[in-house]
């Protein structure tokens, strides 16, 4: 049973959605450009192919014959029925869903089946607070970045912890507009643009993978001659790999400046 005021993180509004639980970011090449091409092609073929009950299987075989199956983590299934739900390509989601097929629910044909797909709730629903959910859905308007961030619990929790400590309160989600929204968006956009991101193909956030096994990565601060950074959880979420002490210091400065800019702007706006 869903709690009162339930926030649907999978499809929060008409401008974005998340497909992470469908394996969207588990492809070896999960860049925006690659995923857009993959989803766009699937959506087109699905619309052209699926007209009756057995057609989804024809679609599935065709997609598997033309797409690269390479994955980061072997155990996570990448669902071929994930595509764009709208012509503007703002929202990703299940092409088998009844809302995409004139009321006919075809999700039993998927790998996990209708019941699991319809009822799955990811850990972010439980560990990210209501205020954080409302704020993040207001900050990020893009499906690609939104999916990367809403599923990264450490990144979300740590950022809101630092800014909340700085302003001595939990920021109200309504405040995330104008300059405050831009500053917060700059931070979460580091998920894509972080200059110290590891180039290892088997890294994803704080995890690294070896076939069907996964482990949590660590930053070797002893090798860098540093104590553990107060931004360590953020660094791991950003898939960081620092080669020198100077790179670590620069990384800390990027995070520190963003947090301090947000705090200063928030306090200034509160006075006006």
Residue ranges and their predicted role:
Residues 34-69:
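Charged, glycine/proline-rich intrinsically disordered loops and linkers
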Residues 1-20, 26-29, 43, 60-272:
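Short loop/turn segments that flank or connect secondary-structure elements
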